[in-house]
Amino acid sequence: ECLEKLQHNREQVIMLKSTVPVGTTKNLAKKFNLKNLVHCPEFLTAANAKHDFVNADRTVIGSPYRIEGVEETYSEMAKELFKRVFPDIPVYTMTSCESEMVKYTANCFLATKVGFFNMIFMLGEKLGLNYNRVLAGVLSDPRIGKSHTAVPGPDGDYGFGGTCFPKDVNAMITTLQNNHISSYILESVWNDNMKYRTNWDWANNTSAVRANETR
């Protein structure tokens, strides 16, 4: 509906700032004949939206009309806007399919990281180990990073919940399966998360629930 109303706007950049399946921006641009539509994935967290926006570690802009080696007009216009307001934040331009994949990749990796450290925590419980001491030793390796290693998590529960991680993990599983790529890793992450997690707070979000899931 919004794009129908903006269909005749040919001068200004129209930015889709959301997490959408790979190919969505390209399909919408084709459907509504919008040369000026770009995709900019959202990296905000619900708890710290304002802080995350002002202190972003990167901005990603994707155009459905980008050609390898050629700068596309509208993604460059969007890039200039961000650089003018946030000169110190790096901006990455790419195709819209690539920018859509960036967000899914980041969220699925972090969900996998949460699942991995929950697994280590559970094993430590069985073996009588102190998780925090184990974690301190592991995190001395700078390649690993502290984020998403707390067990239980910030909400006091195990695994991951909310809307983003469950939705994006399941969307990626579907995308992998539709392209005949093994989704075993993410399926294992998801199935284990349902065992670890007490609060299935994603249950009312149809895009975050897989078929035949029951408690």
Regions found by a protein language model. Name each.
Residues 125-215:
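NAD(P)-dependent Rossmann-like dehydrogenase/reductase catalytic/cofactor-binding core
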Residues 20-25, 109, 113, 161-163:
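Short beta-strand to alpha-helix junction loop
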Residues 23, 69, 167:
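Residues that form or flank phosphate/diphosphate-binding pockets in enzymes
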Residues 1-47:
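Rossmann-fold NAD(P)-binding glycine/threonine-rich loop
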Residues 23, 47, 62, 156-162:
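Glycine-centered flexibility sites
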Residues 15, 107-108, 159-160:
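Short, contiguous strand/loop micro-motifs
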Residues 27-40, 45-147, 175-182, 192:
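Internal alpha-helical scaffold of NAD(P)-dependent oxidoreductase catalytic cores
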